[in-house]
Amino acid sequence: MKLKFFVLALCVPAIFTTHATTNYPLFIPDNISTDISLGSLSGKTKERVYHPKEGGRKISQLDWKYSNATIVRGGIDWKLIPKVSFGVSGWTTLGNQKASMVDKDWNNSNTPQVWTDQSWHPNTHLRDANEFELNLKGWLLNNLDYRLGLIAGYQESRYSFNAMGGSYIYSENGGSRNKKGAHPSGERTIGYKQLFKIPYIGLTANYRHENFEFGAELKYSGWVLSSDTDKHYQTETIFKDEIKNQNYCSVAANIGYYVTPSAKFYIEGSRNYISNKKGDTSLYEQSTNISGTIKNSASIEYIGFLTSAGIKYIF
C-alpha cells in the first residue's frame, strides 16, 4: 500500500506535464504565494491498554483533552508548471497550554465493564504541539474562477503533555473503590508524547466569485504510523506504543476576501481524525531494569479541531 501511495505521488507531476506549453518554463520563481495566520487548536486523544490473555479486553484508558491552544501557522505554495504546485506548511503552539487528563482502569475481569480505579488530573498542560507538511497538487481543472485537483503529501504531528498532582479513587486489597486520596499538587504524575507520521492522498478545490474565494480540502490515509511514550513517574515505568497503518481523515474549509489583487484575508477550519487501532507496547521499569514487549496491547485514537485567521499574499 505504501508503494502505491508513493507511485501516485511521483506520477502527479508527470500526469500534467504534457499540458505545459513550450513557452512556459518548468520553474517560475515569481509564481509563489505565502500565508501566515494565528489560530486555535482543540482536541482529545485516547490512550488505551488491552489484556491479550483475557480476550483483548480493555483494562486502561487515559483521556488527554485540551481546548483553545494558541497556534501560529504559515505556508508557502510554489507553482512549478501550470497544473502542478508544491506546498510546504506548518504550525506550532505558543507556550504551555491548559489541558486535562483522566486515567481509568478496569482491573476486575469478573466485572469488565465496571471501572476499579480512576484518577483526575486538572493540572495538566499541553507543553507543545507542532506539525509540518509537504504536498504536491495536480490541477484537473484550473480556471480563473474555479479549480479542482488531486493532492498527495506527507505530514508529521507531535504532541507533548505533562500531568501534575491530581486526585484518585483506587480499589485495593480486594476492595472496590475503597481508597481515596490526592497527589501533591506540584508532583509530576504522568508525561506523555505522541508522534503521527502520515502519508496521504486527497482532493482540493477552490471557487472564486468577484473578491470572495471559497476553498475545501479532503485528505485520507490508511498508512499512518503512530507512536507514543507514556512515563509514569511514581512507578518509574515507561511505556512505548507503536501502531501501524491507522486510518486518517481530514476535512478543511476556508473563505477569504481579496483586499488587493495579491492579498487575501481568510478564515479556515479543519477537523482531523485518526481512528482507533491496536498495536504493540514496549515497557521498561527503571527501578528493576526489567523490560519487555506485548503484542496487540495498546491503541491510540485522536481527534482535533483547528481554526485560524490570517493573510495570504501572491507574488
UniProtKB/Swiss-Prot annotation:
Keywords: Aspartyl protease, Cell outer membrane, Hydrolase, Membrane, Plasmid, Protease, Signal, Transmembrane, Transmembrane beta strand, Virulence. Induction: Transcriptionally regulated by VirB (InvE). Residues 1-20 form the signal peptide. It is an enzyme of class 3 (hydrolase). GO terms for cellular component: cell outer membrane. Pfam families: Omptin. The keyword Oxidoreductase does not apply. The active site is at D103, D105, D230, H232. The keyword Protease applies. GO terms for biological process: proteolysis. Protease responsible for the cleavage of IcsA between 'Arg-758' and 'Arg-759', removing the entire alpha domain from IscA localized on the bacterial surface. This proteolytic activity contributes to the maintenance of a tight polar cap of IcsA, which is important to Shigella actin-based motility. This is Outer membrane protease IcsP. The gene is icsP.
